Structure formats: structure tokens, C-alpha cells
Amino acid sequence: MGKIKVTNDCNGIKGLKVIEPAVFGDARGYFMETYNYNDFKEAGIDCEFVQDNQSASKKGVLRGLHFQINYPQDKLVRVVSGEVFDVAVDLRSDSKTYGKWFGVVLSAENKKQFFVPKNFAHGFIVLSDYAEFCYKVTDFYHPNDEGGILWNLSLIHISEPTRH
């Protein structure tokens, strides 16, 4: 139905993508496709999502930075209520951007989505009073396969989002 607008290789990091869906609004409200295999494949996101997850968090809650060791996952994330600052850190040891990060504000209002490929650490902090966060993944959850990185690790230097 609707095409998506894609920003590729965010902050020069290969594979990271910010997706802006086509939103069709009228006096009744709006409609948008949150995922369309053909549109995403055309945008270079050709993977099989096997699980959808949703979390709810209060203001200031920090989730992440998490990564999977033996069962890495591509992730497609979005916010359905509230606002978060979402961050991905490149953990690909052979990458020119190893250790580099990119962050984007995702909200119910801007409707942006963020594609995070395998072998990245990922996390978010809730900026609004409350947020509901949805994400698709390409592998099932393996509880003994998760690692983590501290947000304030001096080697990464993650900074807060700027407000205009």
C-alpha cells in the first residue's frame, strides 16, 4: 500500500536504518502499515521476523544495552505510546565503525521505526511519563545468550538527545 521513507547507514554505521512509514490521516484518525515485507525488502531489510515483543516502562527507565552472543537478532523497533531515546552500538569486530553508536528519538507521535541489524547492542531510555515499546526479532529469545554494556561506558560516550 504505502511506501516507506528510509534513512540508511545512520551516523555512517552500515546497516542501521530509520524508517518513516506512510501515514494516511483524515478526520477519523489515521492508518499506516507498520510492516510490509515487499517495502522493507526493497529498502534492504530482507529478513524473517519470528517473534514480536512489547514492553511498558515509566519515565527514566533504561533498558539495555543488550546484545545476543550466539543467537544474534535483527530488530525492528517502534513506540506505540510515549517517547524513548533508542540507541544501537556497533559490536561487529571487523567493522570500521566498531564501538560507534547512533541514537534516535522514537515516539507515538513521530511514528518512526529503527532497524538494528545483528551484532549490535541495543537499548533505550524512556523520555515521556510512560512508553510502550514494540519490536520484531529474527531469532527466539535465549535467556542464557544475552550480554550487556553499560550506557555510561567511557569508550562509547552516549549523549542525551538534543531538544529543539
Q: What do the predicted segments below correspond to?
A:
Residues 1-109, 128-130, 140-159, 163:
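Non-catalytic, conserved peripheral segments adjacent to functional cores
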